[in-house]
Amino acid sequence: MRAPGAGTASVASLALLWFLGLPWTWSAAAAFCVYVGGGGWRFLRIVCKTARRDLFGLSVLIRVRLELRRHRRAGDTIPCIFQAVARRQPERLALVDASSGICWTFAQLDTYSNAVANLFRQLGFAPGDVVAVFLEGRPEFVGLWLGLAKAGVVAALLNVNLRREPLAFCLGTSAAKALIYGGEMAAAVAEVSEQLGKSLLKFCSGDLGPESILPDTQLLDPMLAEAPTTPLAQAPGKGMDDRLFYIYTSGTTGLPKAAIVVHSRYYRIAAFGHHSYSMRAADVLYDCLPLYHSAGNIMGVGQCVIYGLTVVLRKKFSASRFWDDCVKYNCTVVQYIGEICRYLLRQPVRDVEQRHRVRLAVGNGLRPAIWEEFTQRFGVPQIGEFYGATECNCSIANMDGKVGSCGFNSRILTHVYPIRLVKVNEDTMEPLRDSEGLCIPCQPGEPGLLVGQINQQDPLRRFDGYVSDSATNKKIAHSVFRKGDSAYLSGDVLVMDELGYMYFRDRSGDTFRWRGENVSTTEVEAVLSRLLGQTDVAVYGVAVPGVEGKAGMAAIADPHSQLDPNSMYQELQKVLASYARPIFLRLLPQVDTTGTFKIQKTRLQREGFDPRQTSDRLFFLDLKQGRYVPLDERVHARICAGDFSL
């Protein structure tokens, strides 16, 4: 019997015994016995262990909701909120560029963004128009999207790693009327210039040699220098539910999609991070993440824009300079994502690691296997791990430092934040349905797909989707919690324990079935990486002709050709089940990652274990010999012909 059922039964028994005329003490004792016997003691245990956590989480939820309500009623937008911050502390440092040493005060950021707003208004851009921004992370990046927002123009924030077809695709799908690019991106723009429409205006910001100037490009900086720096005389008439900018998905599973970020979503993400981890006005945040993604530009820069913190930017993460920057700029909060923490652990031990003032590291993707090693080596007291995607409505946060957890949902107040793990078909990753057509919720310990109930009138539960309607529709399921409702499908598999803590398992498609067992790519990657001294590893499943399921394949960074596959295999046998050990190995100079340090597997999966597709060293696990053997075209042909036992 579940706790609510046990509670109902105990109340009923109490009423019945009282009705029969027994003393109230007997009735109470009997009711308590019924409650405990029905499993209610588990509920009491959960309450005792999680009440403090849940009440703090509830206070954060209420605080963010009240702040959003106040701003909505006032007709505020993100630029309005920033301007209030700038008026309050004009001379405080807003942004610091660690690469160049350039510092911008709040007054300077406000002035620059005003110039951007006035210039594009003068050029005829109207509220709702789109301008693509394509430059590395530096103060100008923030000033550009903020200034465009002041004019009601939507910025499409392009990934600076995009080239050729993906770059042209993202520009095309954004419906941008203009492109602002940094001088450092001129070559990339030149590669796609013929694919871009002639009506697309181009502006270049930053250093650019005369030989690099494209024929149809205007130099932005001189134009901004001549533009008025006062606020626009007429506000664009936007609100918290209007579009602020587009952020593109990482593209780990195909071409990027443009996720819509409205003003209230920007506020919500930044505010949840601020209050969940008790950030302070005096904090200095170190942000070495890409500004074209939400972690760097909303969770990080949002602390500057909304709450007035100083944010130190570094356009590209550097493991060797990370702690030096933190010491130099007196940083108290740092951000991480993906594999950053592992890269830091690979660095030689230095004294500077212990001279910093960092009290909080906030981000996502810290593997449980290195969580405690990271905190102990670098002396960071608090880890603020969270789960969320730019567009999702089911973000969660680890607010009390539970090792390995990416967040929680209350087991007591389950309806306060309507998210759920639901059972899915392991092959198709489609939600399973019960006899009434509703999704089947998972019990504690059961992995399931994370979903969030959609309510477009609630800024904490709305789903704004993507520029592409078809992409938006693919992320929505109906009749999930109850008949006729709608829910956002995260695409991620998590598992929840009895206390409501959630643990990230896999992104949909990051498991494969082999020998009748489900293999988690993330778990195998963590084991291999640890065995190899935190080396970059990508694990994925590949189809073998005539064989059911997918065989495991591991791509391992081996730039100096020093890895001995069979020495590694001896260790693998001690720590991985036989079905989880990779059948194929690919040793390559480096493993491709996205701009947010997520492993890029699309090309690797497409090329599979075919030696004709790559010049990298390939190996095959010959089970009869019990060792990895080189995989050439002859061995490949024999595998495809079924000559080997797999």
From Swiss-Prot:
Highest taxon, organism lineage: Eukaryota
Induction: Expression is down-regulated by insulin.
Listed EC numbers: 6.2.1.15, 6.2.1.3, 6.2.1.-
Keyword Mitochondrion: yes
Tissue: Higher expression in white adipose tissue than in heart. Highest expression in skeletal muscle, heart and fat. Lower levels in brain, kidney, lung, liver and testis. No expression in spleen or intestine.
Sufficient for oligomerization, as annotated region: 191-475
Example GO biological process: long-chain fatty acid metabolic process
Matches recorded under InterPro entries: AMP-bd_C, AMP-bd_C_sf, AMP-binding_CS, AMP-dep_synth/lig_dom, ANL_N_sf
Compartments, as annotated in UniProt: Cell membrane; Mitochondrion outer membrane; Endomembrane system; Cytoplasm
Binding-site positions, AMP: 246-257
One GO MF term attached to the UniProt entry: oleoyl-CoA ligase activity
Signal peptide span: none
Gene3D superfamilies cross-referenced by the UniProt entry: 3.30.300.30, N-terminal domain of ligase-like (3.40.50.12780)
Phenotypic consequence of gene deletion: Mice deficient for Slc27a1 are viable and do not display overt developmental phenotype or alteration in whole-body adiposity. However, they are protected from fat-induced accumulation of intramuscular fatty acyl-CoA and insulin resistance in skeletal muscle.
Catalytic activity: a fatty acid(in) = a fatty acid(out); (9Z)-octadecenoate(out) = (9Z)-octadecenoate(in); hexadecanoate(out) = hexadecanoate(in); (5Z,8Z,11Z,14Z)-eicosatetraenoate(out) = (5Z,8Z,11Z,14Z)-eicosatetraenoate(in)
Cytoplasmic side: 35-646
Activity regulation field: Inhibited by Triacsin C. Both insulin and muscle contraction stimulate translocation to the plasma membrane in muscle, increasing fatty acid transport activity.
Positions of transmembrane segments: 14-34
Membrane topology: Single-pass membrane protein
Extracellular face of the membrane: 1-13
One GO location term (cellular component): mitochondrial outer membrane
Keyword vocabulary terms for this entry: Cell membrane, Cytoplasm, Fatty acid metabolism, Ligase, Lipid metabolism, Lipid transport, Membrane, Mitochondrion, Mitochondrion outer membrane, Nucleotide-binding, Transmembrane, Transmembrane helix, Transport
Family to which this protein belongs: Belongs to the ATP-dependent AMP-binding enzyme family.
Known function: Mediates the import of long-chain fatty acids (LCFA) into the cell by facilitating their transport at the plasma membrane. Also functions as an acyl-CoA ligase catalyzing the ATP-dependent formation of fatty acyl-CoA using LCFA and very-long-chain fatty acids (VLCFA) as substrates, which prevents fatty acid efflux from cells and might drive more fatty acid uptake. May act directly as a bona fide transporter, or alternatively, in a cytoplasmic or membrane-associated multimeric protein complex to trap and draw fatty acids towards accumulation.
Protein name: Long-chain fatty acid transport protein 1
Gene giving rise to this polypeptide: Slc27a1
